[in-house]
Amino acid sequence: MPSGFRFVSRKQGDILRGGEVMRAPYGLEIIESCMSCPHREDRLFCNLPPAAVQRLAAITSAAAYPKGATLFVEGQSPRGVFILCSGKVKLSTSSADGRSLILRVSEAGEVLGLPATVTGKPYELTADVLEPAQANFISREDFLPFLREHGEAALRVAQQLGETYHSAIAEMRTIGLSHSASEKLARFLLDLSADHEEGKGEVRLTLTLTHEEIAQMIGASRETVTRLFADFKKKQLLQVKGSTVIIKNRAGLESVVSS
């Protein structure tokens, strides 16, 4: 059972199998079923034909997880997949000496644990919840027959695996080919802000990652990340207010990347 896994009592609202009306702790509103999900049309795996969605609801167990919960651990035998309905999850790998590298941060609509579940090999990454999240679990015993029965779902799985591959290549390029830590951090912030530009050119981001976690994403030390944020603030490239980062000068960050 994942760390932080919680079934909610009747007094708070049940988290049940099959898509019933539910409430949950951690300030979440549980999405009752894929059929009624307001984001269904925007999400690759969720936007399936009605027959497939109905079958998906029948084999899915919904649960809410707090920040810090672990869905699965690198090297663990694959039990199944998690459809992330809300919240964010970081996917990381660790070395024998305890060093960690965060490969990506997954958001709502992604299916976690796909490669391991499809191949039967151990989970290749560890999945930790960054903020309160709803993640619907489907066991491997149910998921594989579901893919055989519904070709459209199998195609969506292939699409997500392809997107994950391209994302991993981009991350490797950032870490391996960037000349400096400042370039890596600037590129990281630009990637985060790509879909959030506002009318005046400023971009307001809410960071769910700590400086340590950002360091693990860009292959730097926590001290270096903290120093670079201070340097970027001094150069008026950005402002930091708690967990909110306001990018004031996008062109300036782009010049750091291209320098």
Task: Give, region by region, the residue ranges found by the protein language model.
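Cyclic-nucleotide recognition modules
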Residues: 53, 104-166
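Polybasic "coupling" helices that flank or enter modular domains
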Residues: 148-217
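A residue-level structural signature of the nucleotidyltransferase/glycosyltransferase Rossmann-like core
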Residues: 81, 103, 135-136, 206, ...
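Phosphate-/nucleic-acid-contacting segments
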Residues: 3, 12-15, 20, 188, ...
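Short loop/turn motifs at secondary-structure junctions and domain boundaries
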Residues: 54-55, 71-75, 199
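Cyclic nucleotide-binding regulatory domains
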Residues: 44, 69-132
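Aromatic (phenylalanine/tyrosine) cluster motif
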Residues: 5-7
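Cyclic nucleotide-binding regulatory module and flanking cytosolic helices
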Residues: 11, 18-67, 111, 116-118
